[in-house]
Amino acid sequence: MIIGPRRLALIGAIVAVALAIIFYPLIVRTPIDLDKVSIELTKVALKPSTASEEELSLELTLTLTNLNNFTLTTSRIEYELFADGASIGTSVLSYESVPVNGRPALFPGDSIPLRHLFLYKYSDSGAETFSKIMSNSTQIDWSIRGSAFIESATTLETKQFSDEL
């Protein structure tokens, strides 16, 4: 059976469309300028109703700012929290199970606050920091260090950040 010119053109068109769909993310890449994305620790507050002798709940507010010319989002922020220079633990703020259209939108030239509950468990080595947080968390020098996955329509980049409050 010989393939005629019309069938050959049809097969070629189908292959071209399939290759365009498969290779589109590789061909069109939205470059994210990570220097135009900032992540700041803007608030750490003790939730008083949850304070116990075993565990403290701290509400962190991270402010993400996007100075790029297109909308971005984040799927995951991993961080380590420090109180007066001492590490009190690590945590993850994740939107990975949320569809892309439900994740926090970082619009161009705009900032968005993200709140996350950080659980700090009592330990003998951190007893002094634990009691200081329970008595007055505003007198503590808070700092944070971590990484965030920043996404555009076709690109995923990792942004390293650190900040002090």
Predicted regions and their residues:
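Membrane engagement elements in two modes
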Residues: 1-53, 149, 153-165
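Short structured motifs
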Residues: 42-48, 98-102, 127-131
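Short, solvent-exposed loop/turn segments enriched in Ser/Thr/Gly
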Residues: 54-61
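Asparagine-centered strand-capping/turn motif at beta-strand->loop junctions
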Residues: 62-68
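Short, hydrophobic/aromatic beta-strand segments
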Residues: 70-78, 90-92
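Beta-strand signatures of extracellular beta-sandwich domains
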Residues: 78-82, 145-147
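Intrinsically disordered, low-complexity Pro/Gly/Ser/Thr-rich segments with frequent PxxP/GP/PP motifs
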Residues: 85-126
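Terminal connector regions
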Residues: 120-165
